[in-house]
């Protein structure tokens, strides 16, 4: 599944921002708009036992250019909340459910 970082209208959002994947399915987060974005999973909002550091980008790392991607595969079933650290305050957050 491909998730866009930034809406076509310039909004600071994940598109879609709520989605479901199968365990082990590849999730591709793709910079859509050229603003610097990243993908960080909230350590308090993921299944217990999952290491957020192993599935998140470093808070200092950013996808700067349109078309740059970050890929992750989640295997533990449950719900995972994530955000873009530069734009979390603007509401750039999302949730994925792994079945």
Curated annotation (Swiss-Prot):
Keywords, sorted A to Z: Chloroplast, Copper, Electron transport, Membrane, Metal-binding, Plastid, Thylakoid, Transport
Domain Plastocyanin-like: 1-99
Example GO molecular function: electron transfer activity
Cofactor(s) listed in the protein's UniProt record: Cu(2+)
UniProt binding sites for Cu cation: 37, 84, 87, 92
Signal peptide: none
Any one GO cellular component localisation term in the record: chloroplast thylakoid membrane
Localization per record: Plastid, Chloroplast thylakoid membrane
InterPro entries attached to this UniProt entry: BlueCu_1, BlueCu_1_BS, Copper_blue_Plastocyanin, Cupredoxin, Plastocyanin
Transport keyword on record: yes
Function: Participates in electron transfer between P700 and the cytochrome b6-f complex in photosystem I.
Protein name (record): Plastocyanin
